[in-house]
C-alpha cells in the first residue's frame, strides 16, 4: 500500500479511496488483456457497454472520468481536466497512457476537501441518492466488479 503517497489530503478516507481506485483501475487492465488474448466473449445483452471487450474497457474508463467530474461538480471545485476517454475502437492502443493521465488527474482535486463535505447527499447521474464518499466507494468497486466478471468468464471458458 502506498503509505507515503498523497500525504497532503485533509480527509484520510478520501485519500485512501483515491489510492484504492487507482489500484483497482490498474488491476483491471491485465485481466482485460488476458480476456482479450483468450478471446473471451461477453454475455449477449442490449447494453452497448457489453458489445465487445473494447466497449467494456471504454465504459470502465468513461465511468472513472465521470465519477471525478461529478464529485468536483457537487463540491463546487474546478473541472479536474480529465481528457475524454478513448473510443472503443482505439481503447486498446491508448489505454495505458490514458489510465496514467486519468489517475494523475484523480489525485489532485479532493486534497483540500474536509471530511464533513463528503457526507453530503446528491443525486447521481443515474438518479440514485449518494453521499460523495459513497460515490468514491462506488468508483473503487466499479473496476473491481468488471475484473471479477472477466475472471469468471475466463474461468468458465477454461472449464
Per-range role (PLM):
Residues 1-22:
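Extreme N-terminal tail/first-helix region
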Residues 1-7, 40-84, 122-159:
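Short, contiguous alpha-helical
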Residues 14-15, 24-27, 54-64, 100-107:
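Short, mixed-charge, low-aromatic patches
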Residues 20-34, 70, 86-123, 130-149:
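Acidic/histidine-rich alpha-helical segments that form the ligand environment
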Amino acid at each position: 500500500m502506498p503509505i507515503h503517497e498523497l500525504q497532503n489530503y485533509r480527509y484520510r478516507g478520501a485519500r485512501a479511496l483515491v489510492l484504492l481506485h487507482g489500484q483497482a483501475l490498474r488491476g483491471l487492465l491485465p485481466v482485460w488483456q488476458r480476456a482479450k488474448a483468450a478471446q473471451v466473449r461477453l454475455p449477449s445483452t442490449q447494453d452497448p457497454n457489453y458489445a465487445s471487450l473494447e466497449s467494456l474497457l471504454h465504459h470502465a474508463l468513461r465511468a472513472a472520468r465521470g465519477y471525478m467530474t461529478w464529485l468536483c461538480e457537487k463540491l463546487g471545485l474546478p473541472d479536474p481536466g480529465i481528457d475524454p476517454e478513448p473510443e472503443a475502437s482505439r481503447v486498446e492502443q491508448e489505454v495505458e497512457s490514458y489510465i496514467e493521465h486519468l489517475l494523475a488527474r484523480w489525485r489532485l482535486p479532493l486534497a483540500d476537501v474536509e471530511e464533513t463535505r463528503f457526507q453530503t447527499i446528491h443525486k447521481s447521474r443515474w438518479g440514485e441518492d449518494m453521499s460523495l464518499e459513497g460515490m468514491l466507494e462506488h468508483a473503487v468497486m466499479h473496476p473491481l466488479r468488471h475484473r471479477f466478471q472477466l475472471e469468471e468468464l475466463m474461468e468458465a471458458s477454461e472449464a
